[in-house]
Amino acid sequence: MEERIYLSMLLSTYGSLLTEKQVNVMRLYYDDDLSMPEIAELNNTTRQAIHDLIKRCHKMLLNYENKLKLVEKYKRNEDIKKDIKDKLYILKDKIQDKDNVQLIDEIEKDINSFSI
């Protein structure tokens, strides 16, 4: 299950580097959880052709990630954001000054709006 989620993230990140047909088949397989025979029927092709396309795209997506590391960086940034928010929550509990609590709330809001 973990690999399917990872591949779905790779597809969302690098899908624009694939052809429209490749993206369509990969989304049907990874996001919509259709079987290869079901996808083959929808695309008027063979199960083997779909299998080959999925394997080829899988390899391409992993290759893009190995070179660019965008998903890895995204996950690392999300972990850092969570860690900062956890620390702010602890700090907020310890502070009694209303102005400082408000400042912490603003910092947390800024962290939530940050994305790469």
From Swiss-Prot:
It comes from the Bacteria. InterPro entries: RNA_pol_sigma_r3/r4-like, UPF0122, UPF0122_fam_protein, WH-like_DNA-bd_sf. Belongs to the UPF0122 family. NCBIfam families: PRK00118.2-2, YlxM. Might take part in the signal recognition particle (SRP) pathway. This is inferred from the conservation of its genetic proximity to ftsY/ffh. May be a regulatory protein. This is UPF0122 protein CA_C1753. It comes from Clostridium acetobutylicum (strain ATCC 824 / DSM 792 / JCM 1419 / IAM 19013 / LMG 5710 / NBRC 13948 / NRRL B-527 / VKM B-1787 / 2291 / W).
